[in-house]
């Protein structure tokens, strides 16, 4: 169901059984997979591709222009897999360069007010806590849990099964769970 109060560009590709609620914004060159829900006031901007069974909550802005001096209006993307929950007021910037992309895998839970900068990769089954900031070009492996208000410095890599405590500033690579 697509509300007649939503703005959906005619070029957008909308899957089966997608719900787009009133006042949501779906820009040109956006793809939304089957069984996804886009809540009121969410924005999916040019070059955003989301897979199946995703829920994008109120006021989330996905595919915004990156805040990077290198960005000159290139055709870049945000690519999101399946089964993600992206909560209220999350911002996800697209890639910086032509054909660049910010990528979110499958089964992630991204809580309120998270900011994910340009060219970030978040693999699968991660939890990103409220108010966390992930700077550009970071890579987060599978099943990482980042508690609330974590600041991840640019060009970082967080290993599989890492647990990052609330309020931490991470400037160095984290290897994740080790035996």
Where are these regions (language model features)?
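Structural signal for interior beta-strand "rungs" in well-ordered beta-sheet cores
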Residues: 2-178
């Amino acid at each position: 169901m697509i509300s007649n109060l939503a703005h959906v560009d005619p070029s957008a590709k909308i899957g089966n059984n997608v719900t787009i609620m009133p006042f949501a914004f779906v820009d040109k060159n956006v793809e939304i997979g089957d069984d996804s829900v886009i809540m009121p006031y969410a924005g999916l901007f040019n070059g955003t591709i989301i897979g199946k069974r995703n829920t994008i909550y109120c006021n989330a802005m996905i595919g915004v222009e990156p805040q990077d001096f290198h960005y000159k209006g290139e055709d870049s993307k945000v690519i999101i897999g399946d089964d993600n929950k992206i909560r209220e007021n999350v911002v996800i910037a697209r890639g910086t360069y032509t054909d660049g992309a910010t990528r979110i895998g499958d089964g992630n839970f991204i809580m309120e007010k998270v900011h994910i900068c340009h060219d970030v990769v978040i693999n699968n089954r991660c939890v990103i806590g409220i108010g966390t900031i992930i700077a550009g070009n970071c890579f987060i492996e599978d099943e990482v849990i980042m508690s609330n208000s974590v600041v991840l410095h640019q060009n970082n890599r967080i290993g599989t099964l890492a647990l990052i405590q609330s309020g931490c500033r991470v400037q160095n690579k984290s290897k994740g769970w080790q035996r």
